[in-house]
Amino acid sequence: QPIEQLDMFRAEPNTYVFRPADGRETAAAYLSALRLAAPSVIALSRQNLPQLDGSGKSAMKGGYVIGHEYAGKKLDAILIASGSEVDTALEAKKLLEAEGKNVRVVSMPCMELFFEQDEAYRETVLPKAVRSRVAVEALGGMSMYKLVGLDGEIVSMEGFGASAPGDVLFKHFGFTAANVAAKVESVIAANKC
């Protein structure tokens, strides 16, 4: 199982790596790749993914808020995901909201494009003041540390995969809404100190 490949591609200079979460993000990835004067990698899922509310043109900025927090209330944490894990992050957000947490979900289909946006835009998506961040990616997660910082955590593959139906493997490796929500709770608690 090639869990390290996207980290490897992300480490290559002048290469754009896209991991879209649904059909609209896939279209945005293709349009972006056609406009770039650099190599692009578009990593698609074999799973049937739901069409997500709020996805679309904003994906062309590389990262955007797909699950908004409650306005007027302190933001407790930010969940960052790409590909098939964006839906899992949105489900984890629902669980956390039921516990009274105010959480934002950011879809990050292309980190390279996101970091090319101006500072003002990046701050609207990932405000520096919010240190409680959890990134979710069913791959090796080394490149996600750029997004979560020293105070965040990553739910990622820590070893090679296995052979079984996708839903069985996601549960086995902890890529469930319940596990992601528990990780967010842990990060929030750790950052209160």
Give the predicted meaning of each segment.
Residues 1-2, 25-26, 34-193:
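Thiamine diphosphate
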